[in-house]
Amino acid sequence: MNTLKKYRKLYDLNLSYQRTSNAVATERTYNPTTGGYVTHPVNVNGNWRTDGTFSTNGQFGTNKAFDWSSHSSFSYDHNVDMANVVGSTTHELSTIGSLYLRERLSVNYSQRGWHLGAKVQGSYNRMTGRRSDFKEISAWDYSYGLTARL
């Protein structure tokens, strides 16, 4: 009886969370008498980050000539800092959220020392903030291609 499997699969999952307490920010206050700014360090809380990845890959087909892989990842940053709003003489807390998503896929065929493959990857970034003068950012990026080794 032949017990050799015709395919192989691997999985990998990673998750993490980091939090910063008492981060040092620079507070800047406008002095209308002198026309300058007074700066000094202050502690802020609320900075944290979470991220993760999930990867899987495998082989299939006769002599495991085909292989495929998928790699997904995300991260979210919650950043708190001090900010000056244009026209204001005081400062305020500024909170920015940054989301990053990414996916990468590939399929390959190998036989007798030569190799053909296809790959595609894409990412999405989004930054949001609650300040009235903050402009939200949403951006997509993608790439694709073929590979060969003869």
What are these regions (language model features)?
Residues 1-150:
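Exposed, low-structure sequence patches enriched in small/polar residues
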